[in-house]
Amino acid sequence: MVVYNTLTRRKEVFQPLAAGGSQSVSVGNSQGSAAPVAEEKPLVRMYVCGVTVYDLCHLGHARTYVVWDMVRRYLEWRGYRVKYVQNFTDVDDKILKRALERGESMQAVAERFIAEYFRDMDCLNIKRADFYPRATQSLQAMFQLIQSLELKGFAYRVRDPIRHQTDQSSLLQAGHQPETPASVQYSVYYSVRKFPDYGQLSGRKLEEMEAGASGRVGEEGAEKQDPFDFALWKAAPPSEPGFASPWGWGRPGWHIECSAMVRETLGDHIDIHAGGADLIFPHHENELAQSEPITGKPMAKYWMHNGFLNINGEKMSKSLGNFTTLRQALAVYHPMALRLFLLQTHYRSPIDLTEAAMQAASRGWETLQKGIHCAQHFCKEEKGSPDAEAMQAFQAAMDNDFGTPEALAIAFELAKELTREHNLFTHQGQTHLEPQALKQKSAALLEILATLGFCWPSFSEFEGSKEAATNGELNFKKIEELIAQRSAARKAKNFSEADRIRDQLKALGITLIDQKDGTTRWLRE
């Protein structure tokens, strides 16, 4: 199995740190998970940079987290035990701006959009991380890292004579004025020229870089020793949200947050550090530079990055104003059609979002759904072991740096073949393939799609939805009644009942889309 390492700019044999020199992977079994060679599954420690929680997720976010969900699932299928960590950046100038616009605290804004994040990702069947650390919960780890960098000569202070907050525990809310005397406090910067390997991840040289590119914290070039230095800690006015620190009142720099959270949750040396290609520089470059002088170890063995999702040739981003929220897309397209669209292109290549491409993905998902139903029909009494030839081809595709386009091509061939066989059986009462071969191909299709993170109703649910629709039971009035019951359950905080109703409707081919104003839209799948 090989993966592309951004650090070395080549594909490398995947060998996790915990595996040593032993063989540690094997072919998946019929239950969708791989049987490891060793009794103890080799551990893969994987960190993915998460969202800054000030707005709804856009389709660029969807691509990132579908990709790394796919990678995680495949590693688990191959027999690894993945410890998957993904952070939330819950202190940031963008969150502060949104909080001031709405007259809320940064914490309230962050909490709301964390909840919205989970709603969106659940629609795409993205597995929950093992840990979701937050920047505001890792302050002590940040302080320790910054102090260590100061002691080793990699960081320096810049005096900032503004009032500071001395309370070591409270988060200052926007507009609150602490009654403390004026004092001196500091910003702390990382000196990039002290780290000889700076630029190794991005392949850039200092003289070619753009000064101030880390601009998450509004750095003023005049106060830095070098224009390329970046903030570890930035002093803040007492009227702004912030934290008490060894350097006075302020907020952490963007990059130190992830370094601290990686170290707290996974240790000094991890297997995979992943994120979007836009994070290679400056974020991941700076993470590496500020972590390795402290630990004396490479921060990650494999640095992995997914390509952009483009609109009209430009990366989708909020800063460019060309983004479509995931919520908007889910109001039009089936979640699994969207997942299919995002995985039909290799994860390192850019994707161009067009209406034609999404319509093609929707038709593709319909093809796969037909194949799934046929596979469920052939396997309804007894599930066979998956077809060996198909599974070997799937593994060969995925072992080559997670080749999902080739893997999905195998799934489409199986789906079409099973649909042909099912149609033949329906009209003529016979099939070309023997029953055992049909079961094996059916099991292969279901296992491949499950490993790639697709989900679908069970056979009984599928048949039940068809029968209900035929009998006229799934009419507009019934749908609206169930939605009203679900809304009442949510208001009563009976979330298990609300989820049961949502799942009941989903099994009947109805997708619910909760709106910002509290109403709920529904779509037939």
Curated annotation (Swiss-Prot):
- Predominant place of localization: cytoplasm
InterPro entries tied to this protein: Cys-tRNA-ligase, Cys-tRNA-synt_Ia_DALR, Cys-tRNA/MSH_ligase, CysS_C, Rossmann-like_a/b/a_fold, tRNA-synt_1_cat_dom, tRNAsynth_Ia_anticodon-bd
Instruction: Note whether Cytoplasm occurs among the keywords.
Output: yes
EC number(s) on record?
6.1.1.16
Q: Show the Pfam families listed in the entry.
A: CysS_C, DALR_2, tRNA-synt_1e
**What top-tier enzyme class does this entry carry?**
ligase
Q: Which UniProt keywords apply?
A: Aminoacyl-tRNA synthetase, ATP-binding, Cytoplasm, Ligase, Metal-binding, Nucleotide-binding, Protein biosynthesis, Zinc
Q: Which family does it belong to?
A: Belongs to the class-I aminoacyl-tRNA synthetase family.
Supply the name of the protein: Cysteine--tRNA ligase
| Gene name for this UniProt entry | cysS
